Amino acid sequence: MQMITLAQQAKIASVELAQFENVQKNQALLTIAQQLEQRSAEILAANAKDIEFAKNQGISTAIIDRLLLNESRLQGIANDVRNVAKLADPVGQVIDGGVLNSGLKIERQRVPLGVILTIYEARPNVTIDVASLCLKTGNAVILRGGKETKFTNAVLVEVVQQALETAGLPKLAVQAVTDPDRVLLLELLKLDRYIDMVIPRGGAGLHQFCKENSTIPVIVGGIGVCHMFVEKSADQQKTLELIANAKTQRPSTCNTLETLLVEKAIAVEFLPKLANRMKALGVTLHTDDLQKTEGIEPLDEARMRQEWLSLDLNVVVIDNLTKAVEHIREYGSQHSEAILTSDYQLARQFVAQVDAAAVYINASTRFTDGGEFGLGAEVAVSTQKLHARGPMGLEALTTYKWVCEGDYLVRK
């Protein structure tokens, strides 16, 4: 199928979908969740094919972890869909309004964006997350997964389309591009007549490719060079446990801790404790402030600008909070940054000075997630400032229109 035909079909479906009530959209969502559970064996078998292909291609363990589905992860995806169904539908909400001096009644109402193009790599969960959020908000979506997710996505898209048909919604509101040829992607990125937003989810290369080649607005984000600053007054035992969570809970995610900044005043005391705790967890420290032994490697300045996505952690000793903020400005990706401290005034200073989508005081960066933020599933984590920032839930997939009413009112 030609890409322009695909986009035209999506545009028509988006107009139809926008007219449906919340109850019908929720019925489709609940059917999707049910089918994910009932067809789990089929989905996991398809995923096993993708995993085998990835291993044969020599794809990294971090990417394979993102690609992997198991019973637990699949159940989590189904639960996320049910949670989306429970959320209030933002479409039709009146943001604000009133009656003007002219007598004109005016309201600002939320409406769907229209057609969303999502481009992603080894993340089969994105197929369902994005489809469910777009469905809830009345948007059509074109899904372009990577070649790594070919078999898994084929089954997942089939599940979604069947659920749409069962609920009486337009099947073509969710479509997939299965051919990985980048020429086709380039065609899609030029179809601004039909597609309203592009959301890439993948590495820095994918984001740059979309920014450089798209005539459609692109949401940039998902690159998480996340920092944590251990200020001298922090509770060191609690700090070690928090670092363990932020680094090791799921290292391949974009909200994982990548660089730890330690205030110089406590470095001699704290760093040996850190080294012991991280060694026990299999984490390799990259630092010039500890003697090189097993599990400790020299610091590579270039790697401080990149995600590790693995059990590796940069450790840098910093003079004070001001220097920590300067470091984050230089090396951070405006995703998630944290301070651990007992000094509330310094914490507020950190929040005021750090430019990021999410800033934490005494909490793990792992919370930067649509589900954890109470948004349901997320389509992406935006690190830009327009049109959305941070985890993108339902409201981020809407825009608004001004609805104006008068009694044959004319402007004087």
Swiss-Prot record:
Catalytic activity: L-glutamate 5-semialdehyde + phosphate + NADP(+) = L-glutamyl 5-phosphate + NADPH + H(+)
The keyword Cytoplasm belongs to this UniProt entry's keyword annotation: yes
Keyword Nuclease: no
Top-level taxon of the source organism: Bacteria
InterPro entries: Ald_DH/histidinol_DH (IPR016161), Ald_DH_C (IPR016163), Ald_DH_N (IPR016162), Aldehyde_DH_dom (IPR015590), Glu-5-SA_DH (IPR012134), GPR_dom (IPR000965)
Keyword annotations from UniProtKB, A to Z: Amino-acid biosynthesis, Cytoplasm, NADP, Oxidoreductase, Proline biosynthesis
GO CC annotations, alphabetized: cytoplasm
Chief subcellular location: cytoplasm
Any Pfam family the entry gives: Aldedh
Pathway(s) it belongs to: Amino-acid biosynthesis; L-proline biosynthesis; L-glutamate 5-semialdehyde from L-glutamate: step 2/2
GO molecular function terms noted in the UniProt entry: glutamate-5-semialdehyde dehydrogenase activity; NADP binding
Gene Ontology BP, a term: L-proline biosynthetic process
Cellular localisation: Cytoplasm
Main function: Catalyzes the NADPH-dependent reduction of L-glutamate 5-phosphate into L-glutamate 5-semialdehyde and phosphate. The product spontaneously undergoes cyclization to form 1-pyrroline-5-carboxylate.
Record's protein name: Gamma-glutamyl phosphate reductase
Protein species of origin: Actinobacillus pleuropneumoniae serotype 3 (strain JL03)
Encoding gene per record: proA
